[in-house]
Amino acid sequence: MLKTVVKKGSYHDSVVLMLLTNKISAIEGVKKISIMMATPANKDIFKQSGLDTEELMAASANDMVVVADIDDDALLDTIMEQTEEFFRQQSAKSGEKKGAESVKSWDKALQKLPDANLAVISIPGAYAALEADRALDEGMNVFMFSDNVTLEDEVKLKQKAHEKGLAVMGPDCGTGIIQSVPIAFTNNVAPGSIGIIGASGTGIQELTTIIDRMGEGVTNAIGIGGRDLNAAVGGITMMDMIDAMEDDDAVKVVIIVSKPPAKEVRDKIAARLSNFSKPIVTLFVGEKPEYHEENFYHAYTLDEAARLAVGLVRGEKIPEAVADVDESTFYKAEDHKTIKAYYSGGTLANEAAMLIKDAMDVKVPPEDIEGYMLQLDGNIVVDLGDDAYTQGKPHPMIDPAKRIECMQEAVDDETTGAVLLDIMLGYGSHEDMAGALLPTIRELKAKAENAGRKVFFIATVCGTRRDYQGYDEAVHKLREVGVIVCENNKLACRTAIRAIGRDFVEPEKEVRVKEVVDAPKGVPSEKLRALLSEKPKIINVGLKSFAEVVEQFGCEVVQYDWMPPAGGNVELIKVLNFLRHYDGLDIDEANREVIAKVVASQPVIIDNVRAKEVIPKLNTGKVILHAGPPVAYENMPDPMQGSCVGAVLFEEWADNEADARKLLESGEIHFIPCHHVKAVGPMGGITSPNMAVFVVKNMTDGNEAYCTMNEGIGKVLRFGAYSEEVVDRLRWMRDILGPTLGKAIRKLGGIAVNPLIAKAIAMGDEFHQRNIAASLAFLKEVAPTITKMEMDEKDRYDVIKFLSDTDQFFLNIMMATGKAVMDAARTIERGTIVTAMCRNGYEFGIRIAGMGDQWFTGPVNTPQGLYFTGYDGEDACPDMGDSAITETVGVGGRTGGRGRALVRPPCRYKICRRWRI
């Protein structure tokens, strides 16, 4: 039975609540429990765990919620008593430490530390991007520990930081060292002359700790987040940091560590590094390079990268470490034993999987299985820090429970010959992970021996002798119970591989002449130079433990005890940030700049082509564009779903309605708002790759916009119809009408839109409902050229007849025009002018000049108006379509007083249900 307790306004950070959940779950009689803040993301986690209740769903992001699956009602009192006691103990511990000064707002934080240059953010991902944006506005670099930040937000933040001469490290950045100050989950590493840039937290930890134990040190180790080398992000932070470290006189050697980047990003980085003026070592985990280049070294393992860097600093070759172990008791290959590897560090797990595959001589990559780095012939490598294991639960660096469970399962498997582990030391990690695992290891070794089996436990300890847990103490404890402890992860992997009778080869690499590419070098900003050369001044937003650590290292720090503002409502928070951004600015002046852009626009129809020729996103699989702000297929109204069916049939992705709907519901088709790809669409707005679109170019700014052609009135795709008649018309428009108009427009050198608008408005058009004059004016422009073109006479007649009969034909041209004009205007990114209005039958959305691509949405209305005979309000569909771009640009309904009122516009209607035959 599920029991729920909601603690209103009781905010606690996620790590504290994970530890609390772990403690309470051990109470006898508790089948399942989760204690989290009621953020939207956490509510999803509750739901996935089968713990969603009405009380939970009604709670706000500022409320702590306890949901427990228990049979005894009295047990709930025990749970809450222990919860309160846990918080009392936490408060007592905090009280014992002097700690950084705490504040409750950005304004107070900035008053306390006005020259802060780094914001460390560790709050729920839904809010992290908003706070990072605020930090950038205040001139601060950002270290974003938070995950679950959208790729779109990451791109915006990093572009903004680059423009301001700042850096965003992250999101999901777990490790950093800035001027010997450890940020987040980091080790206590000696200062030195090696700089590191990494898209990998535990990869940085392994590198820095090996370097430290070899007697060298690190200037700065900059985490950039796992997606920085994604094609969409483009390596923004990586490239800026490469420039900054080349400029830093304290850096003698640079190491770059990452998973393999996107090809275009990799090429850009390789070109830049080819003319880097200092020795550099690269490691793309999972790749096996075959050679080095002069002063440009390519490592296979983290150990090799660290040894290369230390050797370059010292000017000597550093030999590999060896394992002090008696191999005579190891298994032979014919014993067919397996390795079970359970890691808390993702990069270390990745390296282990790579080395085991190498040893097994795997030619074909094994199947990817969620939660596993490797699952091959009984050998498994698991990253226990993966989201599959940590949603709503403590990370394995701070809680041994999941690893203990996995080790028990491993020993129960009679094929297991070796169990491979990492022990992560450092700030943020368990205070004695080795000690916490000892009882289980001792018990499992005895269990295997009693069964007449050998199971070798092999570990690597990632840490330094400066770490508060004590490196030597951890190694000693493990060896006391018979664990083979190796100097680094590569050696631990090799030992485990040899323990089951196999090995891998790491041949010596030749050094080739470096091929230098003429690539541009950036000039690091003064703010980046300061970040890498001085102790940071930090505003810590979130986990208090991060502030406590940096203060120990002599940093000025203010602890911002963050709680979700505006009741956790993300949309309201965005509005508040928008208003803050404009506080003290001349909004009227900004608005005048935007309007000046609108007035200066010179839209010209330059072509008519297939949509996929001008919209790259339509070439990335099965993609359909729709009207309005983003909407899932299941939330689309019936007419829009019907339009999607028509598009699928038109594209021949299916040959009947049933298969089309099955495909649409499968998730295989990717839906994108037209507005996201410089397009607009009437009603459903459905646009697929091979549909014909007008191309309108704003000659003033050079930007383009696109819109499908008007099909006329009646059974048409935009109203949700998808019969054979509808699909055949679309194909005729693709094959005959579009190419004919495209050729005519190109022959004319384009058609200026402003003169057509001027003529038509004087004749009574308003360009949304009334377009007769403009449609005929367009026909007047193209008809003479069409009559002279070489083409089939019937096709010529059909084109002219269609244009003559379609009174609304100009609407779609006007929509593309409005989009081209407003897209140019919103490049100002200041002011409060609305730059887009649109509907998707589910939500009404607007964009504002000063907020860029951000959507502000609300429930869509159902229009009230006149209906055709036989229909009434019950048939009406909630409003949809991008055609309100006409009103946005200043025509449509806004010109009603200027044009002659010829007709009251009919309501949008839902009669498509009767058009499916």
What are these regions (language model features)?
Residues 1-521:
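Catalytic-core regions of core metabolic enzymes
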Residues 5, 48, 199, 321-405, ...:
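Anaerobic metallocofactor- and corrinoid-dependent redox/one-carbon enzyme cores
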